């Protein structure tokens, strides 16, 4: 499964940004079918707005992807200590290229697995996880590792596909997206995610739009 994920993102690196930013006509159709017409760009803006530009702590961005959504935000976060991790080396190289072009110097990048984060407990003040939790093969381990490395009082900020909201989206996720290696079952519903979060976090924001969930939760 891990090799399939790597190869799928290697294959898609030439059109990945157009797909997720709705830069082409076909990507607009993709979002209408998969996400129920939700504007992923707007949801990303809302999630990133939860992080102040003058944030001074340590933040983990996993998976960073190509940093197509985050580069402009990170240019403004000059006082933050940011670590960007991705399982796909191809995605990571594109993110690094963007960061260099933007002159960002307060970011460390590394290839790694969210299910085995190479960090001590209570390392990060914030963890940002955009478009990742529908991809990670071992979701239990991903949540566990994020919880372990997040400080008490730190925030987990996330957005991702959830099951049970849109029939067409669920069909596409289970068939085409899974077959291509871009999504990995099983997929949580909104209620599943609440059950994961509530024992360990105070849920500050929790929103479902189309087949996408985005939330902000503070570790107890």
Name each model feature, range by range.
Residues 216-220:
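C-terminal lobe and adjacent flexible extensions of AdoMet/dcAdoMet transferase-like proteins
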Residues 58-116:
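Class I SAM-dependent methyltransferase SAM/SAH-binding core
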Residues 1-53, 68, 72, 174-177:
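Conserved class I S-adenosyl-L-methionine
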Residues 140-152:
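A short glycine-rich, Lys/Arg-flanked "PGG" loop and its adjoining helix->strand segment in the class I
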Residues 51, 76-77, 150:
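A generic alpha-to-beta junction signature in SAM-dependent methyltransferases
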Residues 126-138:
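A short SAM/SAH-binding and catalytic strip from SAM-dependent methyltransferases
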Residues 31, 157-215:
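C-terminal alpha-helical "lid/dimerization" subdomain adjacent to the S-adenosyl-L-methionine
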Residues 115-126:
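A short acidic, Gly/Pro-enriched loop at the edge of an enzyme's catalytic core
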């Amino acid at each position: 499964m891990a090799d399939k994920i790597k190869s799928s993102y290697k294959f898609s690196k030439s059109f990945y940004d157009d797909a997720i930013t709705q830069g082409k006509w076909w990507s607009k159709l993709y979002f209408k079918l998969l996400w129920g017409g939700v504007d992923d760009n707007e949801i990303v803006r809302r999630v990133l707005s939860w992080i102040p530009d003058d944030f001074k702590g340590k933040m983990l961005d996993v998976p960073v992807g190509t940093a197509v959504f985050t580069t402009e935000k990170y240019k403004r976060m000059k006082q933050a200590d940011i670590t960007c991790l991705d399982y796909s080396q191809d995605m990571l190289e594109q993110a690094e290229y963007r960061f260099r072009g933007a002159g960002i110097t307060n970011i460390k990048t590394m290839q790694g697995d969210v299910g085995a984060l190479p960090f001590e407990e209570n390392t990060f003040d914030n963890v940002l996880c955009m478009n990742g939790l529908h991809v990670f093969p071992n979701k239990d381990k991903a949540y566990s590792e994020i919880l372990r490395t997040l400080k008490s009082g730190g925030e987990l900020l996330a957005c991702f596909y959830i099951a049970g909201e849109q029939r067409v989206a669920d069909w596409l996720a289970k068939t085409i997206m899974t077959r291509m290696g871009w999504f990995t079952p099983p997929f949580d519903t909104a209620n599943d995610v609440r059950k994961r979060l509530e024992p360990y976090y105070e849920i500050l924001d929790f929103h479902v739009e189309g087949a996408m969930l985005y939330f902000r939760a503070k570790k107890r």
